[in-house]
Amino acid sequence: MSPFAHPAFFYRGEDEYLATLLPFVRAGAAAGEPVAVALPTGNLGLIRAGLTSLDPEHALPGVRFVDMALAGLNPGRIIPRILLAFADAQRSRHVRIIGEPVWPGRTPQEYPACLQHEALINTVFRGRDVTILCPYDAEHLPREVLSDARIAHPVVIEEGRERASGPFSVDRALARGNEPLTHPDEARAFEFDDGLLHDARTFAILIASRLGIADEATSALSLTVAELTTNSVVHGGGSGTLRLWAEGDQLVCEVQDSGLLCDPVAGRVPPPVDRPGGRGLLLVNELATLVRMHAGTTGTTVRVYLDMQG
């Protein structure tokens, strides 16, 4: 039996939330297991308060707390920045992590990346001595989200009972998150190849300036465009199309090429230290507030959202 466990926990109300998560944390701490708790801001406060009320003097100081609404705003960086970073530092012991990447208020643009994140946990941590427990607010999340959670998790905990999830399928969950990306008519486009990479960056900064990007945000844009366009030239057929537009306070930068994305964990798992390259999408995930990808049969689209104010 694999030591890896990845249950979804469907909760209804604060009492059920605390009744399941607090014992999970305390049992891990009592066993000397490393424990990380990565939850959206309000729920993180609930767990902190609950642990303090149970043990006012110590409150389990060895537990690591992460605000998922900040560190995990872009779902593409949750695996490398939060989950792998914690688990890789504790390889000699069983690791417990609570991770809540989906909550009421996640936008429709963010959700497909959340679903793919949940599916990829199964791939990235297969065979690892890690338990990653994922709470879902069954009172307030749409029914479709709960259905997707059953597809992305091998086990579901609901109403105090743990059951195998019949619909579980990593491939199906990834496919459901692989939504086609359409761009608005007002998007400004630039066709590039290996001789126009510098021009692509210049074009991006010019358009972004017209759209109102702050000066301190241009370096992130320049790095993003450099990584995406270079990736298209090297791996995506030698050329591509760069598009930019604004959505509210976000600058959207998209690159489309004819390359086929063969590795679904690209940009979410650091390559071995002795392997040159392979870190471009990791960097983009760190810079962005959101990264969406669509892998089709005729090409790949990478869409990056950047804060206009940096």
Task: List each model region and its residues.
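Conserved beta-strand-loop-beta-strand hairpin that lines the nucleotide-binding pocket
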Residues: E179-T182, T230-G310
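Non-catalytic sensory/regulatory segments that transmit input signals in bacterial signaling proteins
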Residues: M1-D194, F203, T301, M308-G310
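Amphipathic coiled-coil/heptad-repeat helices and related helical stalk/stem segments
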Residues: L21, H117, V225, G277-G280
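Conserved short strand/loop->alpha-helix "switch" segment adjacent to the catalytic nucleotide/phosphoryl-transfer site
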Residues: H198-A226
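Hydrophobic pocket-lining residues that define ligand/cofactor binding sites across diverse proteins
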Residues: G28, A208, S232
